[in-house]
Amino acid sequence: PRPVAYTTDAQTIERGRYLYASRSCSYCHGAQGTGREFVNDGKGTRIVGPNITPAGVVARYPPEDWNSVIRHGVKPNGRPLLVMPSEDYNRFTNEDLNVLVPYVRQFPPKEGAQAVNDLPHPAWVLYGLGAIPDAASRIDHQLAPSRPTAAGVTLANGQYVANMCIACHGADLSGGMIPGAPPDWPAAADIRPGTHSAGTA
């Protein structure tokens, strides 16, 4: 696996801060990396993103483990992560991965949440049968990372940023049932220009 560089200059940390916020890392792991409950439907489905400060699950990650977890959805022990949108992050450029990880590593060590993946029994059965795939099974692990694109309002940069939307909203952003989600989850919205469909944005 490709290791991640540990660079800590101010420009790196600032770019990492931007990516952490704009690529939805904080939605699952919290603004300070201490973990966050982001799904609780009151009917048996509860999902908590783990603490990723130096006091959490990533404390002993060597550089290559960050690449495996973020880009490939694979734990250091080789097992797939059940809830980690690595198909979104698989196309990260090396440059962006190399600024995101140092930003996360500079969080102050704090006590926080452990990962929770509470799903109804039927969902576990479907997962066991392969009907609900994890991210690792949906990724082309041989695909090279994206090449850097210049920041700005351009088609190339928009396509790169939209990689973060495809996993839920589909390759054409038309929405529909979210791949790998339990059957009773709401559909993702159609977010194509000029459309206003119901669904989860």
Predicted regions and their residues:
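Extracytoplasmic/secreted proteins, especially bacterial periplasmic and envelope-associated proteins
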Residues: 11, 15, 51, 61, ...
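The canonical Cys-X-X-Cys-His
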Residues: 16, 22-31, 66, 100, ...
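Inter-heme linker and motif-flanking segments adjacent to c-type heme-binding CXXCH motifs
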Residues: 34, 76-81, 106-116, 149-153, ...
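C-terminal capping alpha-helices of c-type cytochrome domains
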Residues: 63-69, 75, 88-114
